[in-house]
Amino acid sequence: MNFNEFVNEVKDNIKLFLPKDYENAEVSTMECQKLNRAYTGLMVRKEGEMLTPTINLNQLYEAYKAQPGVTMETVCRKIADIVIEAPIQVDLKSILNYEDVKDKLFIRVSSAEANKEVLENAPHQLKEDLAITYHVAVGKDQDGLSSMFIKNDLLEQYGISAEQLHEDAMKSSPCVMAPEVSSIGALIDEMYQKNILMLTPDEREMLQETLQESSEMPTFFVVTNTDRIDGAGVIFYPEFMDSMGELLGNDFFILPSSIHEMLVLPDDGQVDAEMLRDMVKEVNATQVAPAERLTNDVYHFDTKDHVFEKADRFTERQKEKEAQAAKTEKAGKEQPDQKPKTKKHDMEL
C-alpha cells in the first residue's frame, strides 16, 4: 500500500472507530509546514469545534510499513484513540487576544536554511544560521506541551510589531520553559541511577564503561529546559550566555546538539574548533533524527565583547585584533625620538 492509498483508507474508515458523537464530524487532510518537517495532517472536527489536533499521517505510515503484521484496523484504532484522548480545550478568543497570550510566549530555535520556506511566513530573528521563532503554550500535561506557532497572519491579528513580540517572548520564555544546565556526566549518572534495576549485567557493564569514558572527556555542559524538549532556545534567553561565561570563568564553544539542547564547552585555548565541527557533523549524521537537527556548525561566545558568532568568525576576529595590535606596536616603535630643539639666540658674543 502506497502513502496515498494509506491516507484514503484512513479518511474513509476512521469514523467507524469513533464514538457516535463523531458521526457528523468533518474528516479532512491538509499539507502542514512545520519547523523542521512537512507532513500530511489528518483532522477530525466535530460540529462546533474551532480547534482540533492535526495528526501526522506520514509518521503513522512509516510505523505501519515498519511493522508488517499491523493491520489498517489497528492503525485506525490508534488514530481514533488520539482523536478521543487529545481534544484541544482552548478558548479561541483567548488565543487571538494578545494580552491573554503574552505571558505564555516562548521561543524555539531551528535551522534557518532547513526552514527557509516556513520562515518566510513567520516572524523570526536570525542568530547566525539559527532562527528564533515564537510560540504560544496552549496546554501542558504528562504527554508534553501543546503549542501554537505564531505566523505572520496571527501577528497581524495581535496588532503588534515583530520587535514587541520578540521582547515579550524573551521575558516569558524562562517562565514557560525553565532553563536547566547539567554536565554530561551528571546526565549519564542520572540515567544510570534510574535504569540500573532494569538493566541486564551486560547493559550495566556497558553503561559503567560509558561513565568511565565520560569522566575522561572534556567537561561538556548540556543546556536545555526542564522538560528537555525543544530546549535549544535556552541559550538565547536574556543574559544566559553572560551568566554561563561567569560560571565557567571563560569564553565557550556552543555545539548545536539538536533542537532539544545545546552543548557548551569552555574555551581554554586548547580546543580545536574544526575538530568540534567534525564531531557535530558525525553526530548529526549518525545519531540525530533529521527533524531534530539544527546545523553542522559550531558557535562561540566571547565573554569580553559579549558576542555570539560562528567559531570560525571568532577566530578571524582574533586574528584581526592581533594584527591590529601588532601594527599599533610597530608604529609606536618606529616613532622617532622627539629631541628638544636648540633655541637660536638673536645675538652671539
Give names to the regions the model predicted.
Residues 1-36:
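N-terminal alpha-helical "arm" segments
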Residues 2-3, 19, 70-77, 285-287:
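Basic, alpha-helical nucleic-acid-binding regions used in initiation and control of genome expression
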Residues 28-222:
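Charged, alpha-helical interface segments at or near domain boundaries
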Residues 232-245:
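Short amphipathic alpha-helix segments
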Residues 250-254:
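A short linear hydrophobic-aromatic micro-motif
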Residues 257-263, 267-294:
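C-terminal structured domain segments
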Residues 281-318:
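TerminUS-proximal long segments
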Residues 325-349:
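Non-Sec secretion/translocation targeting segments of pathogen effectors
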